[in-house]
């Protein structure tokens, strides 16, 4: 299903639920508003992940399908039975390099967002099975920044660069992941819990 259609359907369902008098009676106003906010945020997050993954896949299949591999990655490590994942992995098979991505519909830098990207066992697994991890990135809706060797890139900027890279003769991944970004330290959070907004 198209991302726009998914969003239209989910928005209509959330609105119907919000207008349902029985649900209003069961839930307090704060609970209802928090639920609606979280549901909207959840849907937009999934859509952003799917758009980024699909556009990256299409671009690198167009450039050289034998050289580049793009996928989601979710595994359980054998050595410690730990579940780890990346929203996207981009592999340059020719160079033996990997790039790991988390995609977040958020404008906040939250330390928990990078727990898998900082997992040394996971990074070793990637090095051994896909190619040396060259860069770890979070694509999100905030300003570009770099924190603890993890690059935070604005998702809209990434998609614009992706469009340019797809039309460039002999493109390089580094053109897409330009690390010349704001390295100032924004406000950091340790969790991603949000307070309910009053509607």
Language model: regions and residue ranges:
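Accessory nucleic acid-recognition modules appended to NTPase machines
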Residues: 1-86
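Generic low-polarity alpha-helical segments
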Residues: 2-8, 13, 117-119, 136, ...
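Polar/charged alpha-helical tracts
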Residues: 15, 21-24, 66, 124, ...
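Short, surface-exposed, polar/charged, turn-prone segments marking secondary-structure boundaries
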Residues: 34, 117-119, 128-131, 163-168, ...
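Conserved catalytic cores of phosphodiester-cleaving nucleases, focusing on short active-site segments
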Residues: 52, 56, 86-110
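Structural motif
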Residues: 80-81, 93, 128-129
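Catalytic cores of nucleic-acid endonucleases
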Residues: 96-98, 105-158, 183
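Domain-level recognition of nuclease-like catalytic cores that cleave nucleotide substrates
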Residues: 138-199
């Amino acid at each position: 299903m198209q991302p726009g259609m998914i969003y239209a359907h989910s928005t209509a369902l959330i609105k119907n639920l919000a207008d349902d008098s029985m649900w209003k009676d069961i839930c307090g106003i704060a609970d209802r508003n928090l639920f609606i906010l979280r549901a909207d945020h959840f849907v937009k997050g999934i859509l952003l992940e799917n758009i980024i993954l699909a556009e990256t896949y299409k671009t690198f299949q167009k450039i050289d399908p034998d050289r580049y591999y793009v996928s989601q990655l979710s595994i359980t490590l054998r050595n410690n039975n730990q579940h780890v994942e990346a929203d996207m992995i981009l592999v340059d098979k020719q160079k033996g390099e990997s790039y790991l991505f988390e995609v977040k519909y958020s404008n906040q830098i939250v330390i928990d967002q990078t727990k898998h990207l900082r997992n040394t066992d996971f990074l070793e697994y990637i090095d051994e099975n896909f190619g040396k991890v060259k860069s770890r990135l979070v694509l999100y809706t905030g300003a570009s920044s770099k924190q603890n060797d993890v690059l935070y890139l604005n998702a809209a900027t990434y998609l614009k660069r992706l469009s340019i890279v797809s039309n460039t003769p002999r493109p390089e991944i580094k053109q897409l992941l330009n690390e010349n970004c704001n390295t100032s330290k924004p406000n950091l959070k340790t969790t991603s819990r949000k307070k309910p907004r009053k509607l």
